[in-house]
Amino acid sequence: MVYLASKIFGFLITPSNLIATVCLIGVMLSLTRWRKAGVRIGAAGILLLLVCGYSPLGNVLLLTLSERFPAWQESGRAPDGIIVLGGAINPDLTAVRGAPEMNSSAERMTAAAVLARRFPNAKIVLSGGNANPFHPLSTEAEVGRKFLEDLGVADDRIVMEGRSRTTYENAEFTRPLIHPVAGERWLLVTSAYHMPRAMGVFRAAGFNVEAYPVDWRTRGWVDAERPFLT
């Protein structure tokens, strides 16, 4: 119930959905005796849409997240393991269609495949369940394992954590599954804009990981002057 409520709340406060809600409230009020207030609220919603969509604001907000952790540079000994967070795969669509169906964060899985080949002795931990709260057909971890196996990654290298539905649960369920010890090196693979939250959650769980950001959405601070929708 808490998970479902958090998803509904998250949906409502997503900027695009929040702006749409403001506009809708404005339209509804304009049809009542509070017409003037409705017009003002609707106009404010349209103004927010223009500012967020056609100004650099969206890129600036994205950059404040994605630029906190730079691209990983290989140095020192090879990592002992690689943790790949879910969010790249649609497990239910995959179950129906019979082939891995990925979204705009697919780089999480392609990076996992590249790292698996670069570091052949590293464990690959796939942390991702199914965000469908009603009738989940599969998990991201299961689909991810099949994807990596098809690319030649040995099954005995892959560890599946298929219960997590949030970043907090990624850390909560992964740490006791692999029991990391002091001195081990673990890479954490997720989207660049998601990395600050992921690193914070894993560190809070007592799991010392190294950031391996992927799925970059900007070219860097040069995009701070570029309209968000261009």
What are the residue ranges of the model-derived segments?
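Residue-level signature of transmembrane alpha-helical entry/exit and packing/kink sites
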Residues: 7, 39-42
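Membrane-interface helix-boundary motifs at transmembrane edges
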Residues: 30-38
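Hydrophobic alpha-helical transmembrane segments of polytopic
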Residues: 22, 41, 45-48
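Hydrophobic transmembrane signal anchors and adjacent membrane-proximal interface regions, especially
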Residues: 12-14, 36-37, 171, 178
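Membrane-embedded alpha-helical segments of integral membrane proteins
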Residues: 1-30
